[in-house]
A protein has these predicted regions:
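Short acidic low-complexity segments
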Residues: 49-60
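Glycine-rich, N-terminal phosphate-binding loop of Rossmann-like dinucleotide-binding domains
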Residues: 68-69, 149
Length: 215
């Protein structure tokens, strides 16, 4: 039985809590959130004891930490959780800053704990089947991949301020699919982006619509 401590009881935290509760070999034992009411409601719905983040680190009965808090907290939580001997599944991205993300990777290597990012599409049966067909040559040689993604609505502005925005929080899934299917990193990238839905997004220096070409 894998015991899990969940940090972050917002929308995606509830999705993860539901998944943990449905799996026969995992159990949610602790929940922490800066908004205690959110943590209390999640614990009431899916189990687990409401506690602090530090209490999750110190709890020796917890095998893994699932990080579903805001992006600006990810790298520090990853470092502290692995130092405490916990495996980590973290929502993407590791950090808004590439420098800080790389630093986090280096800082956690000595801790020897597995770390995984929430690139769930790699486990989607449709993408897995496509990957298998590509590897087997069943659909010929791949020369061009077109990915079109939509969100039902832009995220709240408060979330955009700390999430990483369109590229680091949302399109990151599409970039990862290119890496997954083609087994490599792009040599170059060109992007055309704009903000046409909500001018508040533009005021943040972010975008709601973009086309990216990776080579």
């Amino acid at each position: 039985m894998l015991t899990v401590g969940l940090i972050g009881a917002g929308r995606i935290g509830r999705v993860h809590a539901s998944t943990i509760s449905m799996h026969a070999n995992s159990k949610l034992v602790a929940v922490a959130d800066i908004i205690e009411d959110n943590a209390q409601k999640l614990a009431s719905d899916f189990g687990g004891q409401v506690c602090t983040v530090d209490a999750i680190y110190k709890n020796k009965s917890i095998d893994a930490v699932l990080v579903a808090s805001s992006t600006d907290t990810h790298s520090e939580i990853i470092e502290k959780a692995t130092l405490a001997g916990k495996a980590v599944l973290c929502e993407k991205p590791v950090d808004i800053s590439l420098v800080r993300a790389k630093q986090c990777l280096e800082n956690t290597k000595p801790n020897g704990q597995p770390i995984m990012l929430g690139f769930n599409r790699r486990f989607d049966p449709n993408f897995v089947a496509l990957k298998s067909e590509l590897d087997a040559g069943g659909i010929g040689k791949a020369e061009l991949l077109v990915i079109t993604s939509f969100d039902p609505a832009p995220p709240p502005i408060d979330i955009l301020k700390v999430s990483g925005g369109l590229f680091k929080d949302m399109m990151i899934h599409d970039f990862d699919m290119v890496n997954f299917l083609f087994e490599g990193l792009p040599k170059s990238i060109m992007v055309s982006a704009s903000s046409v839905i909500d001018k508040k997004i533009s005021e943040l220096g972010d975008y709601d619509t973009a086309v990216a070409t990776l080579k």
